[in-house]
Curated annotation (Swiss-Prot):
Protein name (record): Uncharacterized protein L5
Coiled coil: 95-123, 405-459
Region (Disordered), start-end ranges: 86-127
Family as reported in the entry's similarity comment: Belongs to the mimivirus L5 family.
Biased composition (Acidic residues): 92-122
Length: 461
């Protein structure tokens, strides 16, 4: 008992489940970790909880991450129900039995290499499978989807990829050995093992398996590990992913503002609320024509009674003009944003001359009607169907640009001035970054000089 560390949560003492499991108490089964102990002993959830390290203290958490969330059990429960199992009828034989247990444990470790350090690395039941859409799945250089089992949650530190699937999908036959035997990969950081339970309960948590047959143990990569595997690989099949990952990361880190805006648009669209915040930072307003996406046809078909001739993946959009985009965003949030299945985003906008706002809107709607994209609705006006086909979608955006350029008029001077000022700001930011690096280098040089002088002083002493 003196080996156990107590922690206090809300004036209640707790023991760490892993510490209890590692004691290998006589009369208590051997457990790889505290979670297994709690599950097997049938301990009620009112007697235990999960905690996570937060600086110098522990805070209550969920059981989302096997790596970070630790199980703790109430001290009074442990002392009443767990520790008594340590007692044996013949106390004189306690030490001999402890030695026998240690010998048996050593034999088991030698007989089964795969169970080495289970307690240390906390091998647990694999988390649930994440279902990926076709867009989210990885593809080879030919554009073929690679089916990889993904488990955990959509967090970068709790998402795992099955090594055998990565190996087959990208043609890396010796990937398992590369990860586990050749070094360069750290367990829990780049990879980890999970037990696969093929008979989970309906609640999503793996049930206790009464069969004597052990659960299969499988190797999974963390997201960091997956990136490392793909970036160091010489296999040509990973080129498609590497190009996408490199371009995306570069744009997010060092891209121009236009490139970043384009990336945001590609990934998610621009949230109407975010645009509202941006436009609220200035008291000035400029007339614009705009295109809001309301949602996919499949999500709005019942709400707007959309005909079956339109594809499920087409997008319902709202076209319009306004002299105050911030106000219009509020209005559309209150109407279209409240529709069941709606996800209101600003897809495109451009400034136009105040004299020509109505003309520009009318011409644009007539053009879209002729092209067969206008959606007639008894309640909502100026709706169009934006096709899922990329070429057709680009053609519509081109028509928007043509109309806005035609009616930009006097606003062109203001727009050009805005772009000029934006370029100046970028130039100043770049110059500031250079100056910052220079000052950092000067400080580093001074620190190095001080360090060398301190070493010389110590030698003289």
């Amino acid at each position: 008992m003196n080996k156990l560390k107590k922690i206090q949560m809300k004036e209640t003492d707790y023991y760490f489940g892993n510490d209890i499991a590692q004691l290998n108490l006589p009369g208590l089964k051997k457990y790889t970790n505290g979670r297994r102990l709690v599950e097997d002993q049938g301990i009620s959830n009112k007697h235990y909880m999960f905690v996570r390290h937060d600086g110098d203290s522990w805070i209550k958490s969920s059981d989302k991450s096997c790596k970070f969330d630790k199980i703790i059990i109430k001290a009074d429960y442990v002392e009443k129900h767990i520790f008594p199992k340590k007692m044996k009828p013949n106390k004189d034989d306690d030490e001999e039995e402890d030695e026998d247990d240690e010998d048996d444990e050593d034999d088991e470790e030698e007989d089964n290499e795969e169970e080495d350090n289970e307690e240390e690395n906390e091998i647990t039941i694999a988390p649930g499978i994440i279902k990926l859409s076709k867009k989210e799945k990885m593809k080879d250089n030919s554009g073929n989807i690679i089916e990889i089992e993904v488990r955990g949650t959509r967090d970068h530190d709790n998402c795992y990829f099955r090594v055998s699937d990565v190996s087959v999908g990208f043609g890396m036959k010796k990937l398992h050995d590369t990860i586990t035997k050749k070094g360069g990969y750290e367990e829990n950081n780049h990879y980890r093992y999970f037990y696969i339970d093929k008979n989970p309960t309906n609640s999503g948590k793996s049930k206790k398996v009464k069969s004597k047959k052990p659960l299969p143990k499988k190797l999974f990569l963390t997201y960091l590990g997956l990136l490392k595997v793909l970036f160091v690989s010489r296999n040509k099949t990973v080129g498609n992913f590497l190009n996408w990952a490199t371009e995306t990361l570069f744009t997010a880190h060092l891209g121009t503002q236009d490139q970043k805006n384009e990336l945001s648009s590609k990934l998610m669209g621009i949230s109407a609320n975010i645009v509202k915040e941006v436009f609220s930072t200035t008291s000035s307003t400029l007339p614009t024509i705009y295109l809001f996406s309301i949602g996919k046809v499949k999500d709005l078909r019942a709400t707007l009674k959309i005909d079956k001739e339109y594809n499920d993946n087409d997008i319902v959009c709202k076209v319009g003009e306004t002299i105050d985009l911030t106000r219009r965003i509020n209005e559309h949030n209150a109407t279209y944003g409240k529709l069941p299945g709606a996800n209101l985003c600003l897809k495109w906008y451009n400034y136009i001359d105040p004299q020509h706002t109505s003309k520009a809107e009318t011409e644009l709607l007539m053009l879209l009607d002729k092209l067969g994209h206008k959606l007639d609705h008894p309640k909502y006006d100026e709706l169009i169907i934006f096709p899922k086909d990329k070429k057709a979608g680009k053609f519509i955006i081109d028509q928007f640009k043509n109309v806005s350029n035609k009616y930009i008029g006097h606003v062109k001077v203001l727009v050009d001035k805005i772009k000029e000022l934006e370029n100046e700001i970028k130039e100043l930011k770049y110059q500031n970054e250079i100056n910052e690096l220079k000052y950092k280098n000067i400080i580093l040089e001074k620190d190095l000089e001080i360090s060398n002088l301190n070493k010389k002083l110590k030698k003289k002493k």
